UniProtKB/Swiss-Prot annotation:
It comes from Homo sapiens. The chain crosses the membrane at residues 1582-1602. This is Leucine-rich repeat-containing protein 37A3. Keywords: Glycoprotein, Leucine-rich repeat, Membrane, Repeat, Signal, Transmembrane, Transmembrane helix. SMART domains: LRR_TYP. Belongs to the LRRC37A family. The gene is LRRC37A3. Residues 36-1581 are extracellular.
Length: 1634
């Protein structure tokens, strides 16, 4: 026995030893498979279109100590981060250098100013401080202009200078000083070292003649502009070669600043003007001169507050004082120093200077400047009491009068934009000197603040100080024009600006000088403003750091030459300076002694806050000189250096330029350029009214100054973020200022667009402005006009401007994604370029230059309706952006015929969910990517004719939805030779295929005949048709369903047919294909040859008339159930809203449902055969139950309605057990009874088919619908519905335990069925494997059936979260709906109806048991619909739901801009909602594609179906979606049945050999099924690994059992043998006994 047993054990163990290591190896392989099978998670990261500002520049302290002395280049702006080259000089001037740079530039002034603690300093103190600062700061530091740009691109600066009028100054690159001046922005600008040593010597001279020295210091640069010295200085002033010239100025201007830039006689000033860069003014030897320029130029990014106080001094002493205190320019000194920068230069060589100036800046102004030079002295004298300017009086007293008017001091602080413009005319020269000092100090502290503003302020002073070299010097420093005196018109930059004004100002020397001086000052900030006169206008634009303000404020002096004369007249009355400082940002004060008088009333203090974008402009009435001086001090804020804007005159010119200045789009990116609406007369009137009663705080320009500059400034306040511009204009004296204010509408709309208002003043100025205003002057004018109309408070202005701002900012946002030009042409004016109407956008028959090169994106609200037809025929579209179609989500017909498309990608049509007709004919398409048409599940027609397609590669027509509706495909007129895409042949609905005029072989025809069973008409190439016609009779005899239509040409054609052998052979492959087709299809196929005149086009007119067959309510019912079978609340409301649109009959609903169920049952009867008859019978029973439930639903509805009327809660507790039992049984049975579990899964939820078939609630009773429609109008009825629903939800909680127990029972039931079936089948171990696989499949289904059941139980988190989406989606979810809907109903009936439509669509009548609702009440989920992501409690808190709902609506309304057109970079609330919904549905709808479709449809219905004009389209979408789900479910039923009956085939073909899908139809179907199977989706490999693992586990267990059994047997046998052995002796012994 033992020996016999051993062989048996060996037999058993040997296989074990053989198979033992195998499982280990398999486990390793499985592990690798599992790792590879990790599900791919893709998350869409929304792109953010928002441009991030570079960040607010560091605050610039007004104190010089805050400025780094060590960075010589500090004043320079970083070229890369802030590239303001496009802004032009004005922009550069406007853009404050980085805080350090600007700080350095401002240092001299800040030191003098801050050290004194007041703007005005004693001449000695001022000079000393300037010298110290000069010593401390390198030339680059002193200059506010960015050295990088100036050094790197002097040419650009020259161009800027030309723009600004500094061309002449810049044009004199001869002298190194000019070069320094080029660098002055970066290096020597504050203290132009290039000025002749003479000038420096003068600056070094004792401050005794401080009055003169101050101006001369500043004038040193301008003094260099003096006709005589200017020529010398041009050659040597920068090189300090003109020291000989210094003596003249030295006498007048002994100052430390003069030492650096010794004030030159008017002659020298001329030379300084010649400096190619405003450097002359920037680099005058005298520090005071440079310092002067610095005050003008100084901009402090962080806190930029520049006050420009100019007091014209009648005497040379004033200029000296100004020299000492560069801000103050004595009339005498001023011409020399200031004139260098400004055209104030002495009249000695007026013609020469004119030439030089004009060369440097603009030749136009020489004569004017000469006149101005003369007049400037006069002006200086005339303004004997120049109104004191704000702290920073850049221009000499005379100039201040004119210049201040032209340029209010503007201080801009990127973080804090505070624009204070205070112009106070000083009656006396001494006052002007004081102002100059103060100005210089301010500029010292605020050099960086806003060089352009200061420069602006300074240059206007030049005309006044033409007599005084000192003031000119200051202005020169402030502006680039310092080299040339105004008289010489070397300050041509200034003069040019002023020149336009000078014709008028020529009479008024002061005004012209002021204009000149203002430009002169601008030179100092070449970075900010290159050209003084033009630059001043640019300066007026006060450079703002893109980070903070991003906008340039360019006030245009409304009053021009006359204005300055008027100011001259009124100079005795110093306007009270208005220095409203913005809370956080730079304050810009633009007071001018002369201008203040006339313009000061005009110049309101303008405060701009980036954050609030609120601009407050308060004009201050001009007062006497004494007042002007104190205001200066007050104006100067140590924290915010004030930037002096150009005087009105300069502002006129400069503002036009400044207006032009653009700011980087990153920040505010908008330039505000006010237009001076008032012309010379208004300015005169303003001057007359120059002393405003006080500067009323007019958010917009004050009456006086507001007219010219303030109007512009008013325009300045805009906040890109808020796009809220508040402009309040309080005219102090005249009404004109308000019009000006109105004119100065801030043009926030275009952040990147510079708005340049054109001055309405003199023609000369307007011309200059127009030139300067390269940016659309017309547009600016229009804007200004609109603003003028808005003269009212900023709030009123805001609407007009805001609309503009929003539209433009929107354009800019789009610009982020697409070129602005393209957007401007395509997005903004789409309905102007194309034809919009009747739901159609037609862009055909355009001029060649207008033709589209890419798909245009419409702006929101461009068209009130939706575009269902897009016709882009005959354009130049060569590429389709992936997200461009989001703006056309409702498009059903797209015509791209006759364009330049070369290839199609899988995302080429993303977003066209509703598209049905696609015409791509007559393009240049060569290749079509795989899955190209997958985003188009409802596509019916494709026209690809007349292209260059040579092959249809694998997957061209592949789509997860199988292209269920595609019935017409045109491929003719293509060099098509191969068709390798099996999906083309398997298109389920294809009825018309045109392959005429192609090169397809006979093999393609065979595949079509074999696989395209629904094809009704096939057009083949003529040669192939003729070959077939030769065997017409044979073919039609073999297959009666194939008909050949042969034309006369084929009958008479005897051409040899290469396919003759194959076709003619009765036993050949072709005939066999025909026989096979006859066996499995009855559809008649007509084969025709191509028509000789066959056109590649197709008439699409008939397609539009085609309508979906929606007469059967079952379509709608199933549609809704497919979309959201989970929501079973208040279904009648959904139907009452949807059915009218879908034109469903109001009767026969139950019958239709019954018929549908019957049809489904018949189909299943055909499929379910054999041992599954039990399932078939069970399904029939389920169908009958569903019908009974359907019929009983009507009674239930009626009862419910009655209960609702009575206001009593529905007695649901009694009914629930019965009601739930039906659906639960259905859901439970569906899992194991129906082979169509894939259908459930495919239909977007494990509930699809079972619920649609068994759920009576999905279709409302026929009689109930009309009643509901009638009641819907009754608000009280709607409220009662909600209340009863809420009560019902509360009552249904009791059903949860039942549901849970039922679920368990269902699982038990499933197992028991399996056990019964297994013994029944019992065949072999193979069968056992089969049964195991079947169980495995069923177990995979169980989670979904469980999901269905769990939908009813609160424990199902996934579903509950899904339900929570509904609060936003469906106020009608019984959980959250009651409160939400109730509130909305209280508001309006229409709102209720709309919401019902939007959201009830989601609720959909589901077949789910009532119990499902009960869980909803308890769910607290973060609503995924809520973009904010805040969690709220659906049921309990009414307020939360209501608020959330409102929030969603708001988000939907506001979303279009970011959502649709920014190709977002920021995902819209709709996108976020869709993503969250997709995630929530993951556990319920494992199939990724179906889940995405369902989520997208739900999102569309929720977010985009609120409008009445889209409700019909929405209803169509719902119907189509339901139809698609039905088709997919029907297909999966057959597949599922086959798979369950043939598990071996399912196992091998479905999972193991995916590549074989293209080889055989069966394998293909199996593969598709696996894709649709619940639980497989993207985890096919994982499932395969699990299956293999299960098999291995079973094998191992079996082997172990076998071994154990064998071992036991051996033990038993051993025991038996042992027992026998033990018994044997006993017998022997017994026998042995006797």
């Amino acid at each position: 026995m033992t020996s016999a047993q051993c062989p048996a054990l060996a037999c058993v163990m040997s296989p074990l030893r053989f198979w033992g290591p195998w499982p280990l190896l398999m486990w390793q392989l499985l592990w690798l498979l599992v790792k590879e099978a990790q599900p791919l998670e893709w998350v869409k990261d929304p792109l953010q279109l928002t441009s991030n500002p570079l960040g607010p520049p560091e605050p610039w302290s007004s104190h010089s100590s805050h400025f780094p002395r060590e960075s010589p280049h500090a004043p320079t702006l970083p070229a890369d981060p802030w590239d303001f080259d496009h802004l032009g000089p004005s922009a550069s001037s406007e853009m404050p250098a980085p805080p350090q740079e600007s700080t350095e530039n401002l240092v001299p002034f800040l030191d003098t100013w801050d050290s004194a603690g007041e703007l005005p300093l004693e001449p000695e103190q001022f000079l000393a401080s300037q010298q110290d600062l000069k010593d401390k700061l390198s030339p680059q530091e002193r200059l506010p202009v960015s050295p990088k740009k100036l050094k790197k691109d002097p040419a650009q600066r020259w161009s800027l200078a030309e723009i600004i009028g500094i061309i002449h100054q810049l044009s004199t690159p001869q002298s190194q000083k000019q070069t320094l001046q080029n660098e002055y922005s970066s290096t020597d600008t504050p203290y132009p070292g290039s000025l002749p040593p003479e000038l420096r010597v003068k600056s070094d001279e004792p401050p005794g003649p401080s009055e003169q020295v101050g101006p001369s210091q500043f004038h040193l640069e301008p003094e260099t502009q003096n006709p005589e010295t200017l020529e010398d200085i041009q050659s040597s002033s920068l090189q300090q070669e003109a020291p000989a010239q210094l003596p003249q100025l030295l006498e007048e201007e002994p100052s430390s600043m003069q030492q650096e830039a010794p004030a030159l006689p008017p002659e020298s000033s001329m030379e300084s003007l010649t400096l190619p860069n405003h450097e002359v003014s920037v680099q005058p030897p005298g520090e005071d001169q440079a310092y002067y320029h610095l005050p003008n130029i100084t901009v402090k990014p962080a806190d930029v507050e520049v006050t420009i106080t100019s007091e014209p001094t009648n005497e040379t002493e004033s200029s000296q004082a100004q020299q000492e205190t560069p801000i103050q320019f004595p009339e005498e000194v001023e011409p020399s120093a200031t004139q260098q920068e400004a055209p104030i230069e002495p009249p000695v060589p007026p013609m020469e200077h004119e030439l030089s100036i004009s060369e440097q800046q603009q030749p136009v102004q020489p004569s004017e400047s000469s006149r101005e030079v003369e007049s400037s002295p006069t002006q200086q004298e005339t303004p004997g009491q120049p109104p004191e300017h704000h702290e920073v009086t850049v221009s000499p007293p005379g100039h201040h009068q004119t210049h201040h008017l032209a340029s209010p001091s503007v201080s801009v602080k990127p973080p804090d934009v505070q624009l204070t413009i205070a112009a106070e005319p000083s009656a006396e020269v001494g006052t002007s000197l004081v102002h100059q000092e103060a100005t210089t100090r301010l500029s010292g502290s605020g050099n960086d603040v806003e060089p352009p503003a200061i420069q602006h302020g300074g240059p206007p002073l030049l005309p006044e100080s033409s007599e005084e070299a000192g003031p000119l010097a200051v202005q020169q420093e402030t502006s680039f024009q310092s080299p040339e005196p105004i008289n010489n018109e070397n300050p041509s930059p200034t003069q040019q600006e002023a020149a336009a004004e000078h014709p008028q100002t020529a009479e008024e020397g002061e005004s012209s000088l002021t204009h000149q001086e203002a430009p002169a000052q601008t030179p100092e900030f070449p970075n900010v403003v290159v050209a003084q006169p033009p630059e001043h206008s640019h300066l007026t634009q006060a450079t703002v750091q893109p980070l903070d303000l991003g906008f340039t404020i360019t006030p245009e002096s409304m009053t021009e030459v006359e204005l300055s004369p008027t100011m001259k007249e009124t100079p005795t009355q110093p306007p009270k300076k208005v220095v409203p400082q913005l809370r956080v940002y730079q304050g810009v004060t633009n007071p001018t002694p002369g201008q203040d008088q006339a313009q000061h009333p005009v110049s309101p203090s303008v405060t701009v806050q980036l954050l609030d974008l609120g601009l407050t402009i308060t004009p201050e009435p001009t007062t006497e000189v004494g007042h002007s001086t104190p205001p200066k001090r007050t104006i100067v804020s140590p924290k915010h250096p004030e930037v002096t804007l150009p005087h009105p005159d300069q502002v006129q010119t400069q503002h036009s330029h400044l207006t032009r200045a653009t700011v980087q789009p990153l920040d505010l990116g908008f330039t505000i350029t006010p237009k001076s609406m008032t012309e010379v007369e208004p300015s005169t009137a303003l001057m007359t009214t120059a002393p405003p009663p006080g500067h009323p705080e007019v958010t917009l320009p004050p009456s006086d100054k507001g007219q010219a500059q303030h109007s512009h400034l008013t325009q300045a306040t805009v906040q890109p973020l808020d796009l809220e511009l508040t402009i309040t204009t309080k005219p102090t004296t005249e009404v004109k200022p308000s019009p000006t204010t109105e004119e100065t509408s801030t043009q926030l709309p275009d952040l990147g667009l510079a708005i340049i208002p054109e001055p309405t003043t003199e023609t000369g100025h307007s011309t200059a402005l127009e030139k300067t205003t390269a940016p659309r002057p017309d547009r600016v004018q229009t804007l200004h006009r609109s603003l003028t109309e808005v003269t009212g408070p900023p709030t009123e202005l805001e609407p007009a401007q805001d609309s503009l701002v929003q539209s433009e900012s929107y354009t800019q946002n789009k610009a982020l994604t697409a070129p602005e030009e393209h957007k401007a042409s395509t997005s903004t004016n789409i309905c102007e370029l194309c034809t919009c109407g009747d739901e159609m956008l037609s862009c055909i028959d355009l001029n060649p230059e207008q033709r589209l090169r890419q798909v245009p994106v419409p702006e929101p609200n461009t068209h009130n309706g939706t575009f269902t037809i897009l016709n882009f025929q005959g354009n130049y579209i060569s590429y389709i952006d992936g997200n461009v179609w989001k703006a056309y989500s409702w498009t059903e017909k797209l015509i791209l015929r006759e364009n330049n498309l070369t290839e199609l990608h899988k995302d080429s049509f993303e977003g066209l969910l509703s598209l049905q007709y696609l015409d791509l004919s007559c393009n240049k398409i060569q290749s079509i990517e795989r899955h190209t048409f997958e985003p188009l599940p409802f596509l019916k027609f494709i026209n690809l004719s007349c292209n260059v397609i040579t092959e249809l590669s694998f997957g061209t027509f592949q789509a997860w939805h199988g292209m269920q509706f595609l019935h017409k495909l045109i491929l003719n007129h293509n060099p098509l030779t191969t068709v390798e895409d099996p999906y083309l042949f398997k298109l389920p609905a294809l009825k018309y295929l045109d392959m005429g005029t192609t090169l397809v072989p006979l093999t393609t025809l065979k595949n079509i005949l074999m696989m395209t069973v629904e094809l009704e008409k096939l057009i083949v190439p003529s040669h192939m048709a003729c070959c077939l016609c030769q065997f017409k009779n044979s073919i039609e005899a073999v297959c009666k369903t194939v008909k050949l239509h042969c034309n006369s040409a084929c009958l008479t054609n005897t051409t040899h047919c290469p396919e003759e052998a194959s076709v003619g052979n009765p036993e050949g492959a072709f005939m066999k294909v025909l026989q096979a087709r006859k066996n499995y299809t009855s559809t008649e196929l007509i084969i025709e040859p191509e028509e000789p005149s066959d056109s590649s086009g197709i008439n699409l007119s008939g397609f539009g008339s085609e309508q979906l067959d929606t007469n059967d309510e079952s379509d709608v019912t199933s549609t809704l159930s497919y979309i959201l079978p989970y929501f079973s609340a208040v279904n009648l409301d959904v139907k009452s809203l949807l059915l009218p649109f879908i034109k469903l009959p109001t009767t026969g609903n139950s019958l239709a449902k019954i018929q549908t169920v019957g049809k489904n049952r018949q189909r299943l009867n055909r499929v379910l055969m054999g041992p599954r008859s039990i399932q078939k019978r069970h399904f029939k029973e389920v169908g009958r139950q569903s019908i009974r439930r359907e019929q009983g639903a009507q009674a239930s509805v009626e009862n419910t309605a009655e209960e609702k009327r009575l206001g009593s809660p529905a007695p649901r507790e009694l009914k629930q057990p019965h009601t739930q039992q039906g659906p639960e049984k259905l859901a439970g049975n569906a899992v194991y009874t129906k082979p169509s579990f894939t259908q459930e899964h495919k239909a977007a939820v494990s509930v699809l088919k079972p619920f649609s078939k068994g759920a009576p609630s999905t279709s409302s009773p026929a009689k109930a619908l009309p009643q509901v429609r009638d009641r819907w109008k009754d608000l009280t009825h709607a409220i009662s519905i909600l209340e009863s629903a809420k009560a019902r939800v509360t009552n249904m909680k009791t059903s949860k335990p039942i549901v849970h127990s039922r679920k368990k029972y269902r699982f038990h039931k499933t197992r028991s069925r399996m056990t019964h079936r297994t013994p029944k089948v019992k065949k072999s171990p193979k069968v056992r494997k089969k049964s195991y696989l079947s169980r495995l499949m069923l177990s995979n289904r169980l989670p979904f059936s469980a999901a269905k059941s769990l939908i009813n139980s609160p424990s199902q988190g996934a579903f509950s979260s899904l339900r929570d989406l509904s609060p936003q989606e469906n106020p009608f979810l019984e959980v959250s709906a009651p409160s939400e809907h109730f509130i909305e109903n209280n508001n309006t009936k229409d709102t209720t109806a709309r919401n019902a439509f939007e959201e009830n669509v989601f609720m959909e009548n589901t077949n789910m048991p009532e119990g499902t609702i009960s869980e909803n009440t308890n769910y607290n989920h973060p609503p995924e619909a809520d973009s904010a992501g805040t969690a709220f409690n659906l049921g309990p808190t009414v307020k939360q739901t209501e608020t959330k709902w409102e929030y969603n609506n708001v988000g939907t309304d506001l979303s279009p801009e970011p959502k649709s057109f920014n190709y977002p970079l920021l995902s819209s609330p709709g996108d976020q909602f869709e993503i969250q919904l997709t995630q929530q549905l993951q556990s319920v709808i494992p199939n990724n594609n179906v889940r995405r479709l369902i989520a997208h449809v739900i999102r569309t219905l929720k977010m985009d179906c609120s409008g009445a004009h889209v409700q019909v389209t929405c209803a169509k979408l719902v119907s189509r979606t339901g139809h698609l789900m039905k088709l997919l479910s029907g297909q999966q039923e057959v597949k599922a049945s086959k798979i369950e009956w043939d598990t071996d085939q399912w196992k091998t073909e479905n999972y193991i050999n995916e590549s074989t899908e293209a080889q055989s139809e069966q394998k293909e179907k199996s593969l598709e099924f696996t894709k649709e199977l619940p639980g497989y989706g993207y985890t096919k490999k994982l499932i395969l690994a699990l299956i293999v693992t299960g098999i291995l586990t079973i094998l191992i267990i079996l082997l172990c059992l076998i071994e154990i059994c064998c071992h036991r047997r051996s033990l038993q046998e051993d025991e038996e043998g042992f027992s026998r052995d033990s018994e044997a002796p006993t017998e022997e012994e017994s026998e042995a006994l006797p």
